[in-house]
């Protein structure tokens, strides 16, 4: 297994637990609601949409709990006070996995939490005997693209999202 990624002082790992599904959804919403991703994927800009997305991810037979984490900020006694980051993972095939929705809330960005999340999730994929992991990222999210590159991801293709009919009518 990979070395357990270190978190900054005052943060802790929260492993997947079904009771935490709304916590994941809330962090996902806070992470993406004001970002370009929420315009491309409207469910990310809506708390109910994030709850629905988390349910869709976690009820799939391909869901991998050991790749799914929250990072929480803790008080002096170690009690979680603010959930700051979330990640989930799915099995795509026998040996291939896919990272889903790496999200860090705006006030906790720049602390290395995204990198730690990716590393922790990759360890879970490795424990599940995955030898290849993929993810999708919005090309204009330069910070995320750079992060993924530094942990070993490479661009293998570019995809374009179809324009919705309602947006066409606006022109």
Show where each model-derived region lies:
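Acyl-donor-binding surface of acyltransferase catalytic domains
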Residues: 1-17, 162
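A short beta-loop-alpha structural element at the N-terminal edge
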Residues: 12-39
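Acetyl-CoA-dependent GNAT
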Residues: 31-36, 44-96, 100, 105
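Conserved GNAT acetyl-CoA-binding A-motif
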Residues: 96, 125-136
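Conserved acetyl-CoA-binding loop-helix of GNAT-fold acetyltransferases
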Residues: 101-104, 110-127, 146-150
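Conserved active-site alpha-helix within GNAT-family acetyltransferase domains
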Residues: 111, 115, 139-157, 165-168
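Extended, charge-rich intrinsically disordered regulatory tails
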Residues: 123, 168-171
């Amino acid at each position: 297994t990979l070395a357990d990624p270190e978190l900054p002082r005052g943060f802790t790992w929260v492993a997947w637990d079904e009771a935490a599904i709304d916590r994941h959804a809330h962090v996902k919403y806070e992470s993406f609601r004001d970002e370009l991703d929420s315009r491309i994927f409207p469910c990310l800009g809506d708390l109910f949409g994030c709850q629905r997305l988390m349910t869709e991810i976690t009820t799939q037979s391909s869901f991998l709990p050991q790749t799914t984490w929250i990072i929480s900020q803790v008080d002096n006694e170690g009690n979680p006070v603010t959930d700051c980051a979330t990640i989930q993972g799915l099995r795509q095939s026998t040996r291939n996995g896919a990272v889903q929705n790496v999200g860090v809330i705006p006030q906790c960005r720049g602390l290395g939490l995204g990198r730690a999340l990716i590393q922790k999730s990759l360890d879970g994929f490795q424990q599940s005997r995955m030898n290849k992991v993929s993810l999708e990222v919005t090309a204009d999210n330069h910070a995320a693209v750079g992060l993924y590159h530094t942990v070993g991801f490479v661009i293998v293709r570019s995809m374009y999202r179809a324009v919705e009919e309602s947006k066409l009518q606006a022109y």
